[in-house]
Amino acid sequence: MIYLYTADNVIPKDGLQGAFVDKDGTYDKVYILFTVTIGSKRIVKIPYIAQMCLNDECGPSSLSSHRWSTLLKVELECDIDGRSYSQINHSKTIKQIMIRYYMYSLIVLFQVRIMYLFYEYH
């Protein structure tokens, strides 16, 4: 059984949609699907997916001893034929699609950051 530490600034308790473990032998990861609700008059729910290592033991210092050190999260954007879909309905049936989309998003984000650092320091 996996227990998730949830806090309103990381993963809101009321927005948790589901979680699953991907065991590939080398790096076992936990994927978490959740939504963040924003707004007071017009409520908007934004879907996210997060990834963290299953063996994450938190950070070494006292400030980060209760925080995940491998947590990565990204907003999900689903746009099909100009229509935007922003609700997670069935997290189990879309597991593989989410993993592929999330991994692609992380690779693109990582490449953008590398390019930014390269141009900033050269």
Curated annotation (Swiss-Prot):
Gene3D superfamilies cross-referenced by the UniProt entry: YVTN repeat-like/Quinoprotein amine dehydrogenase
Domain Sema: 1-122
Lineage of source species: Viruses, Varidnaviria, Bamfordvirae, Nucleocytoviricota, Pokkesviricetes
Family that this chain belongs to: Belongs to the semaphorin family.
Further details from the record: Variola virus encodes a likely non-functional truncated version of the semaphorin-like protein.
Name of the protein: Semaphorin-like protein A43
PROSITE patterns given in the database record: SEMA
Family annotation (InterPro entries): Semap_dom (IPR001627), Semap_dom_sf (IPR036352), WD40/YVTN_repeat-like_dom_sf (IPR015943)
